[in-house]
Amino acid sequence: MYLKHLHLRQFRNYRDQQVKFDGAKTILLGDNAQGKSNLLESVELLSTLKSHRAIRDRDLILDSKQASKIQASLERQLGNIDLALTLRSQGKRTVAVNGETISRHLDFLSILNVVHFSSLDLDLVRGGPEVRRYWLDRLLVQLEPVYAHILLQYNQVLRQRNALLKKIRQQKMAAETTGSSPSILTQELALWDAQLATTGSRVIRRRQRLLQKLAPLAGEWHCAISGSMEVFKMEYLANVIVDSNELIIQDSLEGVRQAFLEKIKVRAIAEQYQGTTVVGPHRDDVIFTINDTPARQYGSQGQQRTLVLALKLAELQLIEEVVQEPPLLLLDDVLAELDLHRQNQLLEAISNRFQTLITTTHLGCFDGQWLQDTQILSVKSGNISSFLDF
């Protein structure tokens, strides 16, 4: 797939900017806070409908404007596709494909596949479990768009169940009736238990399936980057039961669901006391080890960077294998975080195989020959022009 054209209107610090991409490699050159990362963010939004930098749509809109629009022309094997995303400070966002508004956002996902790599991705190793869960979920949405609906269902059930647990906790603390007897609340909780186990087991199974595909690819890349000096492993740590991973490997959805219900029973008193759900994939984690040692606690900075680079290259490879087209690669000021060896490994892996958009403040980290067939654009205060014009 190839991104041919991008049009940003009132998005972040871009008032009305069009960009034509002329080759497989494009460098966005400029000082910090000029809009380089904003452009990559717009491409990420077209891919996943999510931004890792903002939660509210109004934070993505220029100044005090009411709306912003991102449009793109994309070339895929099946033909050319025009994408459009309209964000509003008040009201719902809308998406369109080839000029036709799409009511189901699910149908918009995965039309444009991207892998985003920034310095923040180092948190994949050293950050908390929520960072790794978000990484898995974002990748899964690109590979299986229906997963967005599965995850939404689980989160809706989780919110409802937490609200009920909070009521039960308040009732116990008050030690008085509140219009509903404890038995009625308990009966209602049992209904939410069943829904939580059903939706949660689907999330667990898909995450584990993803890791089974991703782990060997990441291991190969890690071996290549480290010179076969280290052994890298990754494992999905489900909190349902200790041996739940074996059930998942056996692809036993019902087995995982039953294990889920059993764990809920075991933690029932703790949940009612705390007033929140402590069982489920929202508490799961991914464990990375190097030579059987946890990378998060004991990995050096160099080892952690090698690990993340291997994961990102594995993402590229997996998406290409599943989608049967190479995804776009977005490199957001990440080369400055890598030493010369890792920079060369990354740039060599990219070559002209993946269309790549790179942000940087200087060109010193690029080989002169690598730059020969690279489009270089200058970014300054939300305005983009050819570097040759400066």
Swiss-Prot record:
It comes from the Bacteria. The RecF protein is involved in DNA metabolism; it is required for DNA replication and normal SOS inducibility. RecF binds preferentially to single-stranded, linear DNA. It also seems to bind ATP. Keywords: ATP-binding, Cytoplasm, DNA damage, DNA repair, DNA replication, DNA-binding, Nucleotide-binding, SOS response. This is DNA replication and repair protein RecF. It is found in: Cytoplasm. ATP binds at residues 30-37. InterPro entries: DNA-binding_RecF, DNA-binding_RecF_CS, P-loop_NTPase, RecF/RecN/SMC_N, RecF_2. The keyword Nucleotide-binding applies. GO terms for molecular function: ATP binding; single-stranded DNA binding. Belongs to the RecF family. It comes from Trichodesmium erythraeum (strain IMS101). GO terms for biological process: DNA replication; DNA synthesis involved in DNA repair; double-strand break repair; SOS response. GO terms for cellular component: cytoplasm. Pfam families: SMC_N.
